[in-house]
Curated annotation (Swiss-Prot):
Protein's name in the database: Cell division protein CrgA
One Gene Ontology biological process: cell division
Source organism of this protein record: Mycolicibacterium paratuberculosis (strain ATCC BAA-968 / K-10) (Mycobacterium paratuberculosis)
Keyword Methyltransferase on entry: no
This protein's GO CC annotations: plasma membrane
Compartments it resides in: Cell membrane
Role: Involved in cell division.
Membrane topology: Multi-pass membrane protein
Disulfide linkage: none
Keyword Glycoprotein listed: no
C-alpha cells in the first residue's frame, strides 16, 4: 500500500484571540435607593387602601373628595407607584 505524503507544518501558527468578557464589579446600592423603591411600593399600597376604605361611599370625608372624583384612575395611580418600585428593585445590588 502506498504511503501518503506528510504535510509540512508551518513554523508559526496564528492563534485566535480569545477574550473572555470581564464582569465589572458594582458596589452595593446606596441606602436612599432602597428607601426610594420601598417607599414607592408603600405609597402605592397606602393609596389603594385609602381609596378602598375611606374615599368610596356616601360617607366619604370631604378631604378625600378629590380622590373619589378620580374614580377608577386610583387603581392606575396606585399600581403605577407599586410597579415603579418593583422595577427599581431590579437595579438593586
Amino acid at each position: 500500500m502506498p504511503k501518503s505524503k506528510v504535510r509540512k507544518k508551518n513554523d508559526f501558527t496564528v492563534s485566535a484571540v480569545s477574550r473572555t468578557p470581564v464582569k465589572v464589579k458594582v458596589g452595593p446600592s446606596s441606602v436612599w435607593f432602597v428607601a426610594l423603591f420601598i417607599g414607592l411600593m408603600l405609597i402605592g399600597l397606602v393609596w389603594l387602601m385609602v381609596f378602598q376604605l375611606a374615599a368610596v361611599g356616601s360617607q366619604a370625608p370631604t378631604a378625600l373628595n378629590w380622590m373619589a372624583q378620580l374614580g377608577p384612575w386610583n387603581y392606575a395611580i396606585a399600581f403605577a407607584f407599586m410597579i415603579t418600585g418593583l422595577l427599581l428593585t431590579m437595579r438593586w445590588h
